[in-house]
Amino acid sequence: MGRIIAGQPVLFRRSRGYVPRSIALSSPVVPLLACGAHLKNTFCLAQGRDAYLGPHMGDLENLETLAAYQRTVACLQRFVGIEPEIIAHDLHPAYQSTRYALARPETCKIAVQHHHAHVAAVMAEHGLAGPVVGVAYDGTGLGSDGTAWGGEILLADLAHFERLATLRPIPLAGGDLAIQQVWRLALALLDDAFDGAPPLPGLALFKEIPAREIALCRRMIAEKLNTPLAHGAGRYFDALGAIGLAATQSHFEGQVAMRWNFVADAGETGRYDFALDTTGRPWVMDLRPMVRQATMDVVDQRGPAVVSARFHNTLVAATAETLRLVRQQHGKHPVVLSGGCFQNARLTESLLGTLAPDFSVHLPAQVPPGDGGLALGQAVVADAVARLL
């Protein structure tokens, strides 16, 4: 399953005809198993110059799926004849794929940061040793500092990465509940952008939300009760989509973000303002000016098609400006785009158009940009790290 983006096919899910066809690696790797992500899981067995991505296993959220995952790993391992010496896994200790990895008998276990793996998957597909500048935009992934990342610009080779820039984080009031009840995301973003006094009465989104719920959500954020911070670009799609579409709930992963993408006016070229804070490390892409302007457009009853298009254009402009500053400080390196947000054709094609012809940009093609391609990145990172041990 996939679509055409920027004139080339991009796979979203590898299945019959692609699995278990090997992906050719530019450099040989030791025998290893990369266990993949928690959502949209695939795993990867690799040895020499061949990497074999397993089939789409789905979300490892119940015992039946986990049992199927374990059987499929064993089946493909027998089929390709690989006895892994290294087991690679995500940093997140609660992922079932991580727990499976840590329970295996092999002694060499290597944890790979989620967004480094996203970038490395595209590097592996295109034979890039690095350094590259990787743009990894998705919903969430555990960062090396213990917070939720997902709006990242990294300077990376296969063994190392440096976090150069990130999106300003959004508080998730209620944790994962905020990803389902997206009005919570919107409220947190609005309070941050408007210094606690957003124009809620002018937004249809909040007309059906009880005042008590709003007050409780604000108290959770103020007192930091079960309210982790999330840097994910996907959370901005959810929050702005909630505001612009008056969508209080997301009934499946990415629902509001996809609706927000689909309504965008293809002909709209305007954008909102943004700021880039370069005083610390990482730099922070601050979209609060955009949030304020987009919200007032919604209050003034400007249609969601225009607001969505301007949101997309602003995220593209902020990313491109950051990449230009990165190049000034770190030199000219290839740019890699990865993460689930780059399944969004408008975002991807617009960013490519903005960066051309000054940047060499690489997209995933035969490996999904989302978590379905993560295991390939885990595999090549783990091999590179193991060679330094």
Task: Describe the predicted segments one by one.
Residues 163-176, 201, 220-225, 360-365:
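Short beta-alpha connecting loops at secondary-structure transitions
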